[in-house]
C-alpha cells in the first residue's frame, strides 16, 4: 500500500512540472514566429505609429521571459489573450471548441473499445478457426487504413451517394436533438475509431491467448469449473489489464486524430480553431489551442496511469 501511495504521489508531483514545461516550450517556439500580432489586429495598412503603440500597450517588445511570466500570470486567471480585429477571447473560443473535441475523442474511444474487446475475445476463444481468421483480416485492415482516407470514403458513401448522413453543417446539442447529434458525429467517430479497433483487437486477442494457456486455467477446467466462469471471472480480469492500459494511453493519439478529423467534417472543435488561427496568423489562438491540447494529453495520461495502478493488484497490494 505504501508503494502504491508513493507511485501516485510521484505522478501528482509530475503533473505541474510537465504542464510548466509544455507552456515554456510552446511559448518559446511561438516567440520565433515572424507574424506581427499588431498587423494581424490592426490590418496590413496600419501606420508605424499605430504598430508601435500596439507593441507598447501589450509589451510585445519585452524579452520573451518577461512576456512568458506575464502570459502565465494571465493564464492562471483564465486569460489567454485575444485574437482578431474584434479582440475575441481565446479562452472563450477554446471553451466552446474543447468539448467538441473531447466528445469526438471519447465516442471514438468507446466504439473502438467495445468492438475491439468483443472481437479480441471471440478471436482468442476460437483460436485458429474461421472466426479468428476473419477477425485477423479485419484487424489488419484497421491497422492499414488511415483515418483521413476512411473519412473521405464515409463521406462519399453516406453523404454523397446514399445521402443519409450529413458531412457538414451545425452540430446540434445532444440534449435537444440527440438524433441529429449522433448523425453528425457517427462518421467522424467511426473514422477515428477504425485504426484503433484494428490495433486493440490484436492486443486483446494476444493477451487472452496468453492467459488461456496458463496452468491455472487448465487446472480450473480439469476441476470441472464451467468455461463461462473460468473465462468470465478469471481470464478476462487478468487478460484485460494490458489492453485497458494501452487503450488509455491511446486517448492522446485519438485527440490528435480528432483534431484532423474535425477539419474534414467541419466540426467546431479544436482542429477548426487551430486552422482558423493558422489561416488568420493568430498567434494567440494557435498558442492557446496547442497548450490546452498538450495539457489535456498530459492530464489524461497521468489519470490513466493512476487508474492502472488501481486495477493492477500486484502494485496495489505491495
Enumerate the language-model features and the residues they cover.
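Juxtamembrane/transmembrane-helix interface segments of polytopic membrane transporters
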Residues: 22, 26-30, 151, 155-159, ...
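An internal, D/E-rich "acidic patch" concept
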Residues: 1-4, 61-117
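Residue-level recognition of pore/gate-forming positions within transmembrane alpha-helices
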Residues: 15, 45, 113, 140, ...
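Hydrophobic alpha-helical transmembrane segments of membrane transport/permease proteins
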Residues: 18-69, 83, 162-184
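N-terminal signal-anchor/signal peptide hydrophobic helix marking the start
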Residues: 9-19
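Membrane-water interface segments at transmembrane-helix boundaries in multipass membrane proteins
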Residues: 87, 137-202
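Transmembrane helix irregularities
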Residues: 33, 142-145, 255
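Alpha-helical transmembrane segments of integral membrane proteins
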Residues: 2-7, 98-131, 147, 176-318
Amino acid at each position: 500500500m505504501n508503494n502504491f501511495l508513493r507511485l501516485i504521489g510521484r505522478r501528482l508531483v509530475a503533473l505541474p512540472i510537465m504542464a510548466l514545461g509544455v507552456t515554456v516550450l510552446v511559448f518559446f517556439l511561438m516567440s520565433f514566429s515572424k507574424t506581427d500580432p499588431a498587423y494581424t489586429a490592426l490590418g496590413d495598412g496600419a501606420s508605424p505609429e499605430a504598430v508601435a503603440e500596439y507593441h507598447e500597450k501589450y509589451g510585445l517588445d519585452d524579452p520573451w521571459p518577461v512576456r512568458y511570466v506575464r502570459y502565465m500570470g494571465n493564464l492562471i486567471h483564465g486569460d489567454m489573450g485575444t485574437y482578431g480585429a474584434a479582440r475575441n477571447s481565446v479562452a472563450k473560443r477554446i471553451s466552446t471548441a474543447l468539448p467538441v473535441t473531447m466528445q469526438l475523442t471519447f465516442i471514438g474511444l468507446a466504439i473502438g473499445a467495445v468492438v475491439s474487446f468483443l472481437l479480441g475475445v471471440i478471436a482468442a476463444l476460437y483460436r485458429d478457426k474461421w472466426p479468428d481468421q476473419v477477425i485477423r483480416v479485419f484487424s489488419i485492415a484497421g491497422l492499414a487504413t488511415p483515418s483521413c482516407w476512411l473519412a473521405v470514403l464515409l463521406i462519399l458513401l453516406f453523404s454523397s451517394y446514399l445521402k443519409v448522413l450529413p458531412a457538414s453543417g451545425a452540430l446540434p446539442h445532444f440534449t435537444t436533438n440527440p438524433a441529429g447529434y449522433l448523425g453528425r458525429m457517427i462518421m467522424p467517430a467511426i473514422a477515428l475509431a477504425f485504426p484503433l479497433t484494428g490495433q486493440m483487437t490484436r492486443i486483446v486477442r494476444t493477451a487472452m491467448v496468453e492467459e488461456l494457456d496458463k496452468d491455472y486455467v487448465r487446472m480450473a477446467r480439469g476441476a470441472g469449473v464451467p468455461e463461462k466462469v473460468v473465462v468470465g471471472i478469471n481470464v478476462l480480469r487478468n487478460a484485460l489489464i494490458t489492453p485497458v492500459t494501452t487503450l488509455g494511453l491511446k486517448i492522446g493519439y485519438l485527440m490528435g486524430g480528432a483534431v484532423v478529423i474535425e477539419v474534414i467534417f467541419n466540426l467546431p472543435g479544436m482542429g477548426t480553431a487551430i486552422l482558423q488561427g493558422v489561416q488568420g496568423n493568430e498567434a494567440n489562438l494557435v498558442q492557446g489551442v496547442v497548450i490546452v491540447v498538450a495539457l489535456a494529453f498530459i492530464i489524461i495520461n497521468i489519470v490513466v496511469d493512476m487508474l492502472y495502478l488501481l486495477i493492477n493488484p500486484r502494485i496495489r497490494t505491495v
